[in-house]
Every structure is written in structure tokens, then in C-alpha cells.
Regions:
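Well-ordered beta-sheet/strand-loop patches within structured domains
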Residues: 1-248
């Protein structure tokens, strides 16, 4: 089954929403369509269906777990899965709202032939930190700060599909996908300061050079910001039915 969401036009039912364009977050018609493809991808994984093609986002998504997103765009990439069971399946989608939040629930119905179930193991191989860039501007009051671009931590992730029998015994563990997410720096605009404080040259009192006692800087153990984290195995999570509102 190929997830067909294009063309992203108002005539096709799409409204403007945040999306990614050349590494920037901008409002675009069809922005946020990846929330549907990502939720469908996760549902297909937990239904133990075959994944034909899937591509992760450039940045980690805040509405679904690492390695469980699937990006789609006009002209590609696409998301596609296959019903590799012996019976028909039905994909049901429901969109609901609660207060200011929107929720998407995708359910895949089929024929139960045994009590087996799926867990997805996520292994974070590397974490890539972001930095903060300060940009002075005349468009803000002196000292005023405004976040021009939000930040994303980068990750290198591998996911595995673990299938268990009804009594909890591991039947199979299969490599599912590699997902590489870039880091994006936070950009903060700061209003330029227009006031300068005059300094009094005054009189400088000479200091006695004397004897300088060296200080022991000690030994600092280097830290590895990119150390791998222990693998985490996820059961069918709550957000699979309630994809949060977000970008992409």
C-alpha cells in the first residue's frame, strides 16, 4: 500500500501548516502531512507488516518516537507498506480534537491467527548536541531577545523489530532501519545596546609582581557528548493512537 498524499494543494484539501524547507521551518500548504504517514508507519510496524519504502525526517520529530517517523514530500520520498498476511486488512483513521490539541488515531484491522505481538527496540548510537547562535539586531529594543529558529538535537538511531509469542518468548529480532537526524542550532536575535558607560582612567596603582603561586588545574576527564545510549525496547505506545500536534 503506497501512502498517497500529494499533490499538496488547497484544492486537494490541504491547509497551510509548519513544514521543513531547506532546513527551515516555514508555513506551507500540506505542512504536517508527515504526521499521518509517521503514525501509519508505526501502526504497520506494530501490526508486523512488511515495510517497502520509508525515509526518516531530516530532524527528529516531537510527535513520535525516534526511528518511528516516515517523511513524505511532493516528488518523493514516499512511504509504502505491504500486506504480507494471508488475509485482507483494513486501515482506519480518526481525527479528533481536545481543547487546543489535535489527535490522529490509525488502526489496522486484520485476522488474528495467533497471540504473537511486536516490540520495537530503539538503539541510539550517537547524540549530536546543538549550539546557540546570538545575532545582534537593530529591529529589537536593546537587550530584548527573540528566538528566530528553534533547536533540534541530532541522533543516529537503529531500530529492530522484535516479535514475541503470546507467552513472552522472543521469536525473532530483525533489523528494521537506520535513521540519521541532523542537529539544528538555536538562533536568538538580541537587540543591540545603544548606551556606553564612560570609564574613568583615574590613577593606576602599580602592583607588586612578587611571587606568583601556580595553581594546579587538576585533571579533567574528557566527556564524550556522542556516547551511545543503552537500547530501549518499546511496546505499542500510547502516542501511536494519539499523534501529537507538531511540525513536519
Amino acid at each position: 500500500m503506497l501512502f498517497r498524499s500529494t499533490p499538496f494543494t488547497a484544492a486537494n484539501g490541504y491547509s497551510p501548516a509548519p513544514g521543513y524547507l531547506q532546513g527551515k521551518t516555514v508555513d506551507m500548504v500540506g505542512g504536517g502531512a508527515c504526521q499521518a504517514s509517521s503514525t501509519l508507519y508505526a501502526a504497520a510496524l506494530y501490526a508486523n507488516l512488511e515495510i517497502v519504502q520509508r525515509t526518516n525526517h531530516g530532524f527528529a520529530s516531537d510527535y513520535i518516537g525516534l526511528g518511528l517517523d516516515a517523511t513524505v514530500a511532493e516528488g518523493g520520498p514516499e512511504f509504502e507498506f505491504r500486506n504480507n498476511t494471508d488475509y485482507p486488512i483494513k486501515v482506519c483513521a480518526a481525527y479528533t480534537t481536545s481543547g487546543s490539541k489535535n489527535y490522529l488515531k490509525i488502526t489496522i484491522l486484520g485476522t488474528k491467527v495467533d497471540d504473537s505481538y511486536v516490540k520495537i527496540k530503539t538503539e541510539v548510537l550517537e547524540t549530536i548536541p546543538f549550539t546557540e547562535e546570538i545575532v545582534e539586531t537593530d529591529e529589537l529594543a536593546p537587550g530584548e531577545r527573540k528566538v528566530e529558529q528553534t533547536a533540534y538535537t541530532g541522533y543516529k538511531v537503529k531500530t529492530y523489530r522484535n516479535v514475541y509469542s503470546g507467552d513472552g518468548k522472543l521469536i525473532s529480532s530483525t533489523f528494521e532501519a537506520s535513521s540519521n537526524y541532523k542537529a539544528r542550532n538555536r538562533i536568538v536575535l538580541v537587540g543591540k545596546s545603544t548606551a556606553t558607560t564612560p570609564t574613568d582612567p583615574g590613577t593606576t596603582v602599580p602592583t607588586d609582581p612578587g611571587t606568583v603561586t601556580p595553581t594546579d588545574p587538576g585533571v579533567t576527564a574528557p566527556t564524550d557528548p556522542g556516547a551511545a545510549e543503552p537500547p530501549v525496547e518499546m511496546e505499542r505506545p500510547g502516542w501511536l493512537d494519539t499523534g501529537k500536534e507538531g511540525e513536519g
